[in-house]
């Protein structure tokens, strides 16, 4: 087997590659998401339609492919210091030609250019029922760090019981933490790496949620639904 470099174009750190039955999608921390074109042997940008106001969504925190349909893909996007720290899920059902935008900022927030951005995909589709999708991020204290959809991403709601996985405050558009967490000092104040849901997987009717909570168990398992 021989390995070589593959051109992907300018756009930051490649933080994840997700494969379906055939299609391949890649995410970057500041340069959007890409789909591999087998005919041209190149990676093609999927989020080129974004304007300056929405540049924060070029920070792609996670990708999920519908296990039953490679053309149905979900991109979890957001950046702590651009686009008012909003978090959205872009959904395509035609392989990236068009996208629906679903804003989930009121429930979770993500920072696709933050530390730990390479630590897995924080969104997953149930292979037994692709209308069910789980998604995680950082949240306000006392809120659930895990949300889910039962209608293919049209609507989302918090999953009860996940309110201690991590939290987020956008007071300075960056996660800040209480004294129980390790804190570093920067010119703008104190901060810590993002804390909350880092990765999600669904298999055999179980949803596995990987977290990053200091001093606690970092994998939570529950029945889907």
Please report, for each region that a protein language model flagged, where it lies by residue:
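Extracellular glycan-interacting surfaces
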Residues: 1-225
């Amino acid at each position: 087997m021989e390995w070589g470099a593959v051109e992907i174009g300018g756009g930051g750190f490649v933080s994840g590659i997700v494969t379906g039955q055939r299609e391949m999608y890649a995410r970057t921390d500041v340069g959007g998401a890409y789909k591999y074109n087998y005919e041209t042997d190149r990676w093609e940008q999927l989020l080129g339609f974004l304007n300056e106001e929405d540049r924060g969504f070029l920070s792609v925190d996670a990708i999920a492919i519908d296990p039953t349909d490679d053309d149905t893909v979900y991109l979890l996007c957001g950046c702590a210091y651009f686009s008012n720290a909003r978090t959205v899920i872009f959904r395509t059902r035609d392989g990236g030609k068009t996208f629906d935008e679903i804003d989930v900022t009121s429930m979770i927030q993500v920072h696709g250019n933050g530390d730990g951005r390479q630590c897995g995909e924080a969104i997953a589709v149930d292979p037994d029922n692709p209308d069910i999708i789980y998604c995680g991020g950082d949240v306000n204290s006392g809120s659930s760090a895990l949300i889910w959809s039962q209608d293919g991403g049209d609507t989302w709601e918090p999953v009860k019981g996940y309110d201690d996985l991590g939290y987020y405050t956008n007071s300075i558009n960056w996660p800040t933490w209480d004294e129980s967490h390790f804190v570093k000092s920067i010119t703008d104040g104190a901060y810590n790496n993002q804390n909350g849901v880092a990765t999600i997987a669904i298999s055999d009717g179980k949803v596995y949620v990987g977290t990053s909570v200091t001093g606690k168990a970092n994998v939570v398992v529950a029945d889907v639904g």
